[in-house]
Swiss-Prot record:
Gene Ontology CC entries for this record: membrane
Lineage summary: Bacteria, Pseudomonadati, Pseudomonadota, Gammaproteobacteria, Alteromonadales
Name used for this protein in its record: UDP-3-O-acylglucosamine N-acyltransferase
Keywords from the UniProt entry: Acyltransferase, Lipid A biosynthesis, Lipid biosynthesis, Lipid metabolism, Repeat, Transferase
HAMAP family associated with the record: LpxD
Membrane spanning residue stretches: none
Organism this protein belongs to: Shewanella frigidimarina (strain NCIMB 400)
Length: 340
């Protein structure tokens, strides 16, 4: 696919600097770009690469464009502009519309126009697939589940029964949606399983990475709202609610019945304990353990930073002595006041 700078300027609302008829075929970094490619400068620390780039054109802010002598598209946010152009020129392979001969589809399932069902996929009873849904090889969609139009399941995704996924979503390989939540009652030391009879409700424009697990609700539903992005190997337990446009990085864990607000960022390897709520706009740093309610937006951290091992060992010992040291300081303060 080829597109001119003029066409891209119309897409982005950008100002053209240079040849409006120049054709672009793909995007690349400043360092790797060659003729026919569009690049971008979103961080001034890469300005030296801008001067040396072989890109045919560059997405720039107005400030950076004033010092650049090549072809440019001037935008308010070059990184967002890059994302939009990358979407336009995306060459990711798509499933061919139609049903592979090895796919197993229940006669009660409803398939929208343009749906693509890959090899060895299984579509259960009363499933509804919207228009242009892509179901990759080896996927399973359980009974009474609904998948909205233009949503794609990559190979080997498992969607259990009573799961609703909205339109324009992406679910990557190995992910499981709707497995049983970790619900058990303890009867004199023996675990009694609680049937997980809720479902999962996923909104529109949601992307879920590879090998992520989203448990079904115990009674009500687990909910992932519109615009949420979830990385690889994330665990979302039963009855969790993830608010609109929240981002969750790899390896993060949300325990059962916790609610995460809108526009939050959950850093990689972080964990939120069960039955808690996190306010809108909260940024949880990577590796943080959240064990109490967060009521106000802001950045929250708890992980110990990496340090040389000997220093870490000494500090760990001191941390264990912290309560004793605090008591000693209080005693010294009282003694000092008494001697005044």
């Amino acid at each position: 696919m080829k597109v001119t700078l003029k066409e891209l300027s119309q897409l982005l609302g950008a100002t053209i600097k240079g040849d409006a008829t120049l054709e672009i075929t793909s995007v690349a970094t400043l360092e790797d770009a060659t003729q026919g490619q569009l690049s971008f400068l979103a961080n001034s620390k890469y300005r030296a690469q801008l001067e040396a780039t072989q890109a045919s054109a560059v997405l720039l802010s107005e400030k950076e464009a004033s010092c650049y002598h090549g072809n440019a598209l001037i935008v308010s946010d070059p990184y967002v502009g890059f994302a939009r152009v990358a979407q336009l020129l995306d060459t990711t392979p798509k499933e061919t519309p139609g049903i592979h001969p090895s796919a197993q589809i229940d006669t009660s399932a409803i398939l929208g126009d343009g749906a693509a069902i890959g090899a060895n996929a299984v579509i259960g009873a009363n499933v509804i697939l919207g228009e242009n849904v892509q179901i990759g090889p080896g996927c399973v969609v359980g009974e009474s589940s609904i998948i909205g139009s233009n949503t794609r399941l990559w190979a080997n995704v498992s969607v259990y029964h009573n799961v609703h996924i909205g339109h324009d979503c992406i679910v990557h390989s190995g992910t499981v949606i709707g497995s049983d939540g970790f619900g058990y009652a303890n009867e004199r030391g023996n675990w009694v399983k609680i049937p997980q009879t809720g479902g999962v409700r996923i909104g529109n424009h949601v992307e879920i990475g590879a090998c992520t697990s989203i448990d079904r609700g115990a009674l009500s539903h687990t909910e992932i709202h519109d615009g949420v992005i979830i990385d690889n190997q994330v665990q979302i337990a039963h009855n969790v609610v993830i608010g609109q446009n929240t981002a969750m990085a790899g390896g993060s864990i949300i325990a059962g019945s916790s609610t995460i607000g809108k526009y939050c960022i959950i850093g990689g390897g972080s964990a939120v304990a069960g039955h808690l709520s996190v306010a809108d706009g909260v940024h949880i740093s990577g590796g943080t353990n959240v064990t109490s309610v967060i009521r106000e937006k802001g950045v929250y951290s708890s992980a110990t930073i990496a340090m040389e091992n000997k220093l870490w060992r000494r500090n760990t010992v001191r941390f264990r002595q912290l309560d004793e040291l605090f008591s000693r300081v209080k005693t010294l303060e009282k003694s000092a006041k008494g001697s005044e």
